[in-house]
Amino acid sequence: MGLPKLNRLKSPREFQAVYQRGQRYQSDRLVLRVLWITDKTSNPAPTQFGIAISQKVSKKAVVRNRLKRQIKGAIRVLLPFIAPGAKIVISVRGNVSECQYEHFLRELKKLLIKAKIIYGHTREYFL
């Protein structure tokens, strides 16, 4: 099961904007790029996510798709805690084809806290 449509980055133009103007946060396995949307309305747009996995990670599409599913699952778990109004692209670094879901969840939590996207909880409480 994927992410809700409201929470997906779709067009290459959106990905390019995040890559060019977004802030970068990285861990051992993941790279998080964040572009905050400055919306003048009182209702900010929901946070949107995109996942980019290069063929350098694995030549096999099966492996890349499995990694995408694991990352989407981690995002779904964290979605209620995520502040609205950002566009986020998550990239995978190096050889992570052997990583488990729990590793992605833990690293994604750390990166989202570092980027101040998870709100309402202190670092000690959430980790």
Swiss-Prot record:
Q: Which keywords accompany this UniProt record?
A: Endonuclease, Hydrolase, Nuclease, RNA-binding, tRNA processing
The biological processes this protein is annotated with in GO are:
tRNA 5'-leader removal
**Sample GO molecular function, one term:** 3'-tRNA processing endoribonuclease activity
What is this enzyme's catalytic activity, as reactions?
A: Endonucleolytic cleavage of RNA, removing 5'-extranucleotides from tRNA precursor
Fetch the InterPro entries from UniProt. Answer: Ribosomal_Su5_D2-typ_SF (IPR020568), Ribsml_uS5_D2-typ_fold_subgr (IPR014721), RNase_P (IPR000100), RNase_P_CS (IPR020539)
User: Which PROSITE patterns does the record cross-reference, listed alphabetically?
Assistant: RIBONUCLEASE_P (PS00648)
Task: Give the EC number.
Answer: 3.1.26.5
User: What Gene Ontology terms describe where this protein resides (cellular component)?
Assistant: ribonuclease P complex
Domain of life (superkingdom)? Bacteria
Please describe the quaternary structure of this protein.
Consists of a catalytic RNA component (M1 or rnpB) and a protein subunit.
Q: Which family does it belong to?
A: Belongs to the RnpA family.
What job does the chain carry out? RNaseP catalyzes the removal of the 5'-leader sequence from pre-tRNA to produce the mature 5'-terminus. It can also cleave other RNA substrates such as 4.5S RNA. The protein component plays an auxiliary but essential role in vivo by binding to the 5'-leader sequence and broadening the substrate specificity of the ribozyme.
- The molecule here is called Ribonuclease P protein component
Q: What is the lineage of its organism?
A: Bacteria, Bacillati, Cyanobacteriota, Cyanophyceae, Oscillatoriophycideae
